[in-house]
Amino acid sequence: MNWKFWQRRDDTIGPDPTEAHPLGEGFSSGDTAGGDSSASGLFKGMITVAAIYLLAALALGIWWSQEPDRFDIETAARELGQSGDTNVTGYLTTATTITVAKTLLEKPGGYLTNDLFAPGIWLDNMPSWEMGALTMLRDTARVYRNDFSRSQSQSAENPNLAEAEGKFFFDNNSWFLPDTEGEYKAGIVYFQNYLGQLSDQSANDAQFYARSDNLQAWLAAMDTRLGSLSQRLSASVGKRQLDTSLAGDANASQSTATPAEQMVQTPWLEIDNVFYEARGFTWALLHVLEAVENDFGEVLDKKAARVSVRQIIRELEPTQETLWSPMVLNGDGFGLVSNHSLIMASHISRANAAIIDLRALLAQG
């Protein structure tokens, strides 16, 4: 009952406490509805942002997974911009090695192996490719330090090359303190310093010796790597393999016993990793082989071996053909599905055999 004569009904706030009302009548639900609407809008906004992020990461991942194209070694050598003589022995091979290292860091997405965030952390094919190219770079840097830059075993090593080798052998998966990219960039700088010394005709503190034994040392390193890659690629389908570790030497021994026969097979989840590692290694090797043909031209011509180097290049070129399949296929033997690993192993095995023949030819006096 509204017994206060000065208070009109429309001035009251809420229900009359003296009158009975159904439970809940007179209370507004506007605040509750507004809260639910705000929470729903926030949730939808978060979903939208997450979807946009995932789509952008997917697009970047596809772009970053594109392998670098082959480059022209002479153009790359000119672009390095050394002020000295660019026609000196070893200049083209050194400039090519530097360009391979720079491409490893400057390709789309940069260096991905040590990434901690999307999309880099989701990718595994490109880090495997980087590992292959890095392996070739490390082997070449070691041969530079021990062979290419030294006249004989008792000669002093070049300090720039000694530092460069250590930088390139730094952990390939370090994100911080120090980061891998920083160490590899330092290695490139040391190689550029060596290149500058080579092109300076007024200085003789750095040399590149284009000799047959030096070339054999580098080919031996490449031979070993190609042989390993060929075996790992061939094991994609699994095969029974005899132990030939001590074959050819009746007096040889080994530290621990191994089975006379064992099944060798690459784990299923590692098949594409081995495939892309092989592509990265052969990509880098192709460029350095082209430079070696130029810098060791006189040595090769004396043995009529220039055509052998060109044949090795010809055997390796198919390893860089476009992979049209969205994934690395692993068909079994002569089955209906292609086996990309076996095709890659075939090309690498032929190139490896040609390198072995070239080494034998160079060793013949």
Regions found by a protein language model. Give the residues of each.
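N-terminal intrinsically disordered, acidic low-complexity segments at the extreme N-terminus
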Residues: M1-G30
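A cross-kingdom marker for long, charged
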Residues: N2, E74-E79, N273-Y276, T282-G365
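Hydrophobic membrane-insertion alpha-helices, especially the h-region
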Residues: M46-L60
